[in-house]
Amino acid sequence: MTHIENIPHILQNGITHTTSEYANPDFVPIGDGSLITTRNNFILNNGTRLGEYIPFYFGVRTPMLYVVQNGFNLVAPTSAENIVYCVSSVQKIIDLQLDFVFTDGHAVDGFSSQYTVADIQNIDTILDKNAINAKYWKDENDLDKKRRKEAEFWVLGDISLHAILGYITYQRKCKKQDNHLWCRCYQCSY
């Protein structure tokens, strides 16, 4: 998920890291800065830093989207019209032979486990798809639901434009740039 103002750069360079030679000099951040710092320094089981990876959620309507839109945790609110989901797939990342890890919950939560390409054949049993697809994550009968809803897929390094299958935004009016339609209309706002 990214700010709509980052899309022109993504269309030219793919999704890039701040340390990439192709990094967006005009990057517009969204999200909790303190969490981003924590993630950047979090060491994965394979010895790499989580900050070296590009994050994806498995579902929409995530707690992060809620925080970004509503401005909690010292995060400035960003309107739904300015938020874009960059969509890829596990299969596409595998086909492009990109290195990745995935988690069964929020990546920096101590209860979450990390998995690699060696575990991918079991992804359907590892992930809790009911929690991932749930509209609400607060559940008095399941206090771990929010963590599982935030299961993540992390791709190492920059992601080329070829790995991006589409874009989802709340906007009803799609835009064209360089003769490519770059947003699909879909309502996933809170």
Which residues does each PLM region occupy?
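Active-site-proximal loop/hinge segments that shape catalytic or ion-binding/gating pockets
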Residues: M1-Y190
